[in-house]
Regions:
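Short beta-strand element of Class I
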Residues: 29-31
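N-terminal Rossmann-fold NAD(P) dinucleotide-binding loop
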Residues: 13-17
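Rossmann-fold cofactor-recognition segment
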Residues: 49-64
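Conserved Rossmann-fold cofactor-binding substructure of NAD(P)-dependent oxidoreductases
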Residues: 61-77, 84, 88
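Helix N-cap at the beta1-alpha1 junction of Rossmann-like dinucleotide-binding domains, i.e.
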Residues: 36-39
Length: 217
């Protein structure tokens, strides 16, 4: 991939560019962009201190497709990694189509005025990306994403058969605060208050938020 543009300078964006800098043989040229460039500069300073790698920074309002297109043309990346808010997914996908650049995100699109989990908005882009010869890798955060890689590795290298697979997503850390989230607080609250969905009896079953519990050892 070599040259990559990361949009979004929150907690996830910070972790991502630090990890990219640790793998400079793959990500040899990194640009971090956000609406507030001061956040990008602070992260870039941390990356330099921790890894010795210099990353570029830029300002962009990802709600503005034309501005995002202009930045992509200026940077010339092979891949745009969208770590901004889910509200901006479609705008950034439009910008990637306009510039002929591959796309990756970690969270599915949601409209600003409605907390609704729905893949269809982004899946509707499939033909356009395919016809343009471009990749759009969606939802490759932790669940799914990292957990899928873990499960595939276990299946391929460690176990002969798998009967069931339970994925427990929790945070064992302590921020020392009464309330702290792992990523954008608004999105986090949307997720935990949304109707729950689980796979049971060969189909998806939906229920009220926080209506199911499971004990584990």
């Amino acid at each position: 991939l070599s040259k990559v543009l990361v949009i979004g300078a929150g907690g996830v964006g910070s972790v991502a560019v630090h990890k990219m800098a640790m793998n400079a043989d793959i990500f040899s040229d990194i640009t971090l962009a956000s609406r507030r460039v001061a956040k990008c500069d602070a992260i870039a300073e941390s990356v330099k201190t921790r890894t010795g790698v210099t990353i570029h920074t830029a300002q962009v309002d990802a709600d503005d497709v034309d501005a995002t297109v202009a930045l992509i043309k200026q940077v010339g990346p092979k891949l745009v990694v969208n770590l901004a808010l889910p509200y901006q997914d479609l705008n950034i996908m439009d910008a990637c189509l306009a510039t002929g650049v591959h796309y990756l995100d970690t969270a599915n699109y949601e409209p600003r005025d409605e907390a609704k989990f729905e893949y269809g908005w982004q899946w509707a882009y499939q033909d356009r990306f395919r016809d343009a010869g471009l990749m759009a890798l969606l939802g490759s955060g932790f669940d799914p994403g990292v957990t899928s890689v873990f499960a595939s590795y276990i299946k391929k290298h460690l176990l002969d058969t798998i009967d069931t697979l339970d994925i427990l997503d929790c945070n064992g850390g302590d921020h020392g605060q009464h309330f702290a989230t792992n990523f954008n607080p608004e999105i986090n609250i949307r997720e935990v208050t949304a109707p729950s969905r689980h796979w049971e009896g060969g189909q998806w079953v939906e229920g009220p938020a926080l209506s199911h519990k499971q004990a584990f050892d």
